[in-house]
Amino acid sequence: MDEDTRAEYESTSQQLRIDLKTWETDWAKSHEGKKPGRGDIKANEDIAAKYKQYNKVRDILSGKISPPSKHAPKSTKRKSDGLSAQTPIKQNKHIETPAKNRTQNHDEDLMNTPAISRKLFSPTSVTSVGPTPQRDGQVLGLFDLLVEKELGTPSKKDSATKTGSARKVDATPSKRSAATDDDEDERLGRTPMSSSKRQRLDHFLTPLKNKDGNKDAATPSSVSKLQFDTPAFLKRNTLPVLEENGDFDAPAPLRLPRKPFARGLSEIVASLRKVEEESLDDDLDALRDIEDGGMGEPKPKTLFPSKPKDDILVDDNEARQLPLGGFDDEGVYDSPVEGDNPTRVYKKKGQKRTTRMAKMRPVRVNRPENMAANPQSDVENDEIQAGGEDAGSDFDDIVEKKPAQKKEGTVKKAARKVNELAHANFQRLKLRNHGAKGGPGINSRFRRRK
């Protein structure tokens, strides 16, 4: 918006604002100092129009609405014609059957540009898939359709084409020649044969001599005219003509992708590390000079420095702290296994053990001295003691003590005998999750077969 237009809109807005303020002041005086509401503004059509115009001008100045053009475009809406006074005349439709054009000149089709080839080979977008073209139950290919439709299929023999004159329906019938009558009578006088019989008999017949061989003689057309070659837009690239007698050229060198000129991050880190190591080596050399000579003359540098002595017998287990972090040199750890730096192979963890492990170890238990009382065992022990190793010796003089007789009393129920040699491995465990996987018949070799 130029300055003149803006100044014009600003003056219009100022004038409208003065008019509206004057009306509001008069309204307030006549209505005890109250401001007019929406209903009061709408009741006065002149003031309502000024309010709308004022808001529109302010929106144009603020840029919310583009200013209207001075030359308003004329509406191109079509105006409806007035109603006609009289009834329109009904249009007569043609009831007669349209005549069929029976004359077909195939020579003109061959001379014109082949439209079928253009349709077949042009890259048009497929809108719908049609039925597969067939003939006598056999699927026709792309080039079969091309040849048939362009050159014409000799399936239907037209008598008008044979004689070379087009039939005229409306013309007066002319008298046929005698030769034509003879051919017609000969054709009608023969007994018709089936196509299979005629085809079988043709193998044994001598072919008739072509009396007029140059009647339909013509220069054979080239393959390019039949549109059998690949169209130009479908050819990928044209190959040069090969010389059969010439020597084979050496194969072109393989172009490998070049490395980028920009330095990689690992290369930058390695170069910075080298710079830091050189500065640290200089500091160490200065410290050694101070320790050795007490700030004396520096030692002359030799052309071939001697190798440091191998005083380190065992490497330090702690990893060396790198100042910048990352790799020591370029190309380290670029591949999974390189040199003496094999990567750690992680083993996939499987399912943990679900049964309780019990290691079977021999348990040494001393037999208790007081075993369960058995009368037979006591008698046997007494007999063994009576006739033992010391029988018949000096100990025979010792008076043998008679065993004390036990008093007969009430028989007590014997407690349940527990063998002390029973091992904990043969105890039944009370597992809380027993049967959680479906009971004893699940995943068992001894379950009942279905």
Swiss-Prot record:
Residues 93-109, 150-160, 199-215, 398-411 have a biased composition (Basic and acidic residues). GO terms for biological process: DNA replication initiation; double-strand break repair via break-induced replication; mitotic DNA replication preinitiation complex assembly. It is found in: Cytoplasm; Nucleus. It holds the Pfam family Drc1-Sld2. Residues 59-137, 150-223, 288-413, 428-450 are annotated as: Disordered. The keyword Cell inner membrane does not apply. Keywords: Cell cycle, Cytoplasm, DNA replication, Nucleus. Residues 345-364 have a biased composition (Basic residues). The keyword Nucleus applies. GO terms for molecular function: DNA replication origin binding; single-stranded DNA binding. GO terms for cellular component: cytoplasm; DNA replication preinitiation complex. Residues 122-131 have a biased composition (Polar residues). Has a role in the initiation of DNA replication. Required at S-phase checkpoint. Belongs to the SLD2 family. This is DNA replication regulator SLD2. It comes from Gibberella zeae (strain ATCC MYA-4620 / CBS 123657 / FGSC 9075 / NRRL 31084 / PH-1) (Wheat head blight fungus). The gene is SLD2.
